[in-house]
Amino acid sequence: MILKYPYATEKASMIVERDGQLQFIVDRKASKGQIKVAIEKMFDQPVTRVRTLMNNRGEKKAMVSFSNPKAAEEILSRLGIM
């Protein structure tokens, strides 16, 4: 499984409201293309950009931007986070 879980912190919530970006913890070996395809397939929303980083605990975090500005809030409400 490429997507492990959504990264839900106070800072991540501010980024959703400000930029419309979602953050996910993903498999360390997943590429940006694989992450994009997995998110588009799971949530039926077109992804415009995927940025990744490795945190100090060895987890890979993906920041995902959507073409629809309200897509991130819609996805979080479907997941029951927001």
UniProtKB/Swiss-Prot annotation:
Keywords: Ribonucleoprotein, Ribosomal protein, RNA-binding, rRNA-binding. GO terms for cellular component: ribonucleoprotein complex; ribosome. InterPro entries: Nucleotide-bd_a/b_plait_sf, Ribosomal_uL23, Ribosomal_uL23-like, Ribosomal_uL23/eL15/eS24_sf. The keyword Transcription regulation does not apply. PANTHER family: 60S RIBOSOMAL PROTEIN L23A. Binds to 23S rRNA. One of the proteins that surrounds the polypeptide exit tunnel on the outside of the ribosome. This is Large ribosomal subunit protein uL23. The gene is rpl23.
